Amino acid sequence: MRFNLLLFKVSAILLLVIAVSCNQNELPVHPRIMLLKGEESALKKNIASDEIWDATHHFILDECEKICDLPPVKRELIGKRLLDKSREALRRVFYLSYAWRMTSEDKYLDRAEMEMLAAAEFEDWNPSHFLDVAEMTMALSIGYDWLYRELSPESRKLIREAIITKGLVPSFDTDNNWWLAASHNWNQVCNAGMTFGALAIYETDPGLASEIIDRAAGSIRLPMEDYLPDGAYPEGYSYWGYGTSFNVMYLSAMEKAFGKEYDPELNEGFLKSASYLENMTGPSGICFNYSDCGAGGSLQPAMFWFAQKLNDPSLLWSERHYLLSDKPSNDRLLPAILIWSNGMAINDITPPAYNIRVGQGKNPVALMRTSWENPDAIFVGLKGGSPSVNHGHMDAGSFVMEANGVRWAMDLGMQNYNSLETAGVDLWNMSQNSQRWEVFRYNNFVHNTLTVNGKLQVVDGYAPITGFSGQHGMLNAITDITAVYREDLKSATRGIAIVDDRYVIVRDELETNENESVIRWNLLTSADVTITGNNTAELVKEGKKLVMKVTEPAKVKLKTWSTVPQHDYDAPNHGTIMAGFEISVPAGSKAVLNVLLLPEGAVEDASVSSKSLAEWPKDSSDQ
């Protein structure tokens, strides 16, 4: 792909165009990336003032002791990727460099130098999968910059040349730099890695460094626009953690290197995305894992940058729980948390003010809960959007639900990419007839949404969130899912509500076209399911119960379906089952599907349960 740098120089107005005429005298001396010379003292003071920061600091030091006993990372690919080795190199070098700056103990310096020299000797950093290059470049750039004055001249030369020849120069190869024009996590990660490299070697190669910094300022604007209008990240929880963390690593490095000259004019959607991410985790600690995402929640370093930038400690409510856990995160960016939390105390972190959060954009989502502080609170996530987004699944209209600390309605999430790629699956083809949609976990058949006439959702269909309300007693959101079923339905709308903080309603209002349609309603769960009547089923897990009750149609036959996949390449789904029902709707007819999810002890309010979606409260609050 031939790339037009002028395009990015023009588009960089909303961020910053750093003129190539900048010279190295305008940059701080080494260390200049994220933590300037002398800033260690303030960091030490903050760590000493809070036992959680102190525990995090000592966890990093303990990990460094383990790293010192390990051989350096080797160039060993998994499939087409070197990424796990690049990530481990970044973890090691970042941790060790941090440890040296905070303790001045030579063992950390020596081990970081060994790690960097080993990576510098690799034949390449696998530019055909450029994420690998980006993370390795960031690793060596942090070590080179933070340890610059202590490295021998020979080591400096070898590491600097590796950053340039194996990191920066390959980013101009048009066979590998397609990510410059992308609007997803690849852009954020790769531009961050290249910018770290440019900042590290600025004084010896100012022309190359300036060109890369200037290029990144325009290019990284593209994915940052995808957070508009209100912060919902199209790729979901896991890739928010990846793309956004590297995006703020980029911003943090630029802010420190250029000071007041750097004013990126961050868009509102990007800044609001921290609230989106915080709301994505339920009381159980499990995230809403739609799209390519694992099941568990995890510490998100970028949240600490947002909390500091917005002066809003409540953004760290979920992160606080991860830090308080017995086993701290081993995230490769963990030292950045201590840099970005400087001046904040764990005791200053309060719960968020709102119990509902709605995000529109390319992949809309609504998130609601009855409480932030009660571990037994009800939590619901409802997804609109489109299968066509990067890393998307056929999950428009799908939802997750938990109560009493149990995730009752779940999402299987992603399958390991290499397991599918090595089986020859055409995984990254997003067209309607792609083999991607034959993967069990990726299509609508296994998600908590509808299947019409046994067909896949329409890939280029889009389901907006059309209404929501934060009204106490009737938290709700509604999505128009017509477009993903447009071949078979004239209209389809799904609403989900939490009623009186006690139970959940899932309501679908449908209209068929000129043909009869068979509608399947599905709920995926890891609970034990017992059909207790035509319209009711009991779910049991961890000694707790939930009743699934269908109030419309008046009579259906609930059933269960196996989650054993049909293809050898599909991952197993042990301990899960699907429950639901099928109905036939005549041509040109309307139908209502109304399902209640009643945690143990909850009593239905029939006057609310029977209300149409048009009767549900709606507001336009800016959550």
Regions found by a protein language model. Give the residues of each.
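CBM-like, beta-strand-rich accessory domains located in the C-terminal region of large
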Residues: 24, 319-324, 419-623
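C-terminal motif of bacterial Sec signal peptides marking the signal peptidase cleavage site
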Residues: 19-21
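Bacterial N-terminal signal peptides that target proteins for export
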Residues: 1-11
